[in-house]
Regions:
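NTP-dependent nucleotidyl-transfer catalytic core
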Residues: 1-236
Length: 236
C-alpha cells in the first residue's frame, strides 16, 4: 500500500519512499525542558508515534531523531530563578519527559540529542554560514542569518517579505512570537544569562534555537535533505 505525506513545499500529498536501506529518516521537535510537558505537547508526540507506526506498518524502517532543547531563554530563566545549575534544572524535566513517554506507550526515538551536547557542531555550522555570506556578526557579538541572502527563504511558510511588519524583535528565541527579518544563530552573552555560555569565534554566548536543530539533524541524519521533519509551525 502506497503511503503519502503532505509536502509543505509543494503543498500537496506525495508518496513517501525511503532514499536508501528501506529506512525513513525522521527528525521531530522534542521538548524544551524548562517545565513538565503538558497534554498539548504530548498530542504532538502521540501523532509522531502514530506516524512512525504507520511507516513501519507499510514495511519500512524508521530512524527517528528527537532533539531536547536544554538551553534557551526559558531554561536559563528557570535555572536562574531556582538558583541551580542549568544542567541540574533541565535534567529534572528530561527525566519526567521520558517517564511520561513510557507511560503513554510511545515508541522511543533512536536518538535523543541534547542541544548542550552539540555546541561545537553548532559553532561550526554558523562558521560555514558566515563563509557562504548568508550570516553576519553584529556589533555585540551575536550572529544573524540574513534571510535576504538565501534565495527561496520563506517558501515553506509562504512568507511575503514585502508585506511583513518591521520593528518586531528577532533576537529572543522565545517560541510565542514570530521572527521578523534576520534571526539569531548565535546570541552574545548577557548578564541575565548568568554562568551559561560557551566560547566561540565571536565571543562568549550560546546558540539561537534555529541553529540547534539544523546542526543535530545534520549530525545524525546527514546534510542531504531527504528526511521527514515534524514540529511546530515556527519551524517551517
Amino acid at each position: 500500500m502506497e503511503m503519502k505525506v503532505f509536502n509543505s513545499l509543494t503543498r500537496r500529498d506525495e508518496p513517501l519512499a525511503p532514499i536508501a536501506d528501506n529506512t525513513i529518516r525522521m527528525y521531530t521537535c522534542g521538548p524544551t525542558v524548562y517545565n513538565f510537558a503538558h497534554i498539548g505537547n504530548f498530542r504532538a508526540y502521540t501523532f509522531e508515534d502514530i506516524l512512525r507506526r504507520a511507516i513501519q506498518f507499510n514495511g519500512m524502517r524508521v530512524k527517528q531523531v528527537m532533539n531536547l532543547t536544554d538551553v534557551d531563554d526559558k531554561t536559563i530563566r528557570g535555572a536562574n530563578a531556582a538558583n541551580v545549575k542549568l544542567t541540574d534544572y533541565t535534567q529534572t524535566y528530561k527525566d519526567a519527559f521520558f517517564a511520561d513517554l513510557k507511560k503513554l506507550n510511545i515508541q522511543p526515538a533512536e536518538v535523543y540529542p541534547a542541544a548542550t551536547d552539540h555546541i561545537p557542531e553548532m559553532i561550526a555550522l554558523v562558521e560555514k554560514l558566515i563563509e557562504k555570506g548568508v550570516a553576519y556578526k553584529s556589533e555585540d557579538g551575536s550572529v544573524y542569518f540574513n534571510v535576504r541572502k538565501f534565495p527561496g527563504y520563506g517558501k515553506l511558510a509562504h512568507i511575503d517579505f514585502d508585506n511583513q511588519r518591521t520593528g518586531a524583535r528577532c533576537a529572543a528565541d522565545e517560541y510565542d512570537k514570530e521572527n521578523v527579518g534576520d534571526f539569531a544563530l548565535w546570541k552574545a552573552w548577557e548578564p541575565s544569562d548568568g554562568p551559561v555560555g560557551w566560547d566561540s569565534p565571536w565571543g562568549r554566548g550560546r546558540p539561537g534555537w534555529h541553529i540547534e536543530c539544523s546542526a543535530m539533524s545534520n549530525r545524525y541524519l546527514g546534510a542531504v535533505v531527504s528526511h521527514l521533519e515534524r514540529g511546530a509551525v515556527t519551524a517551517v
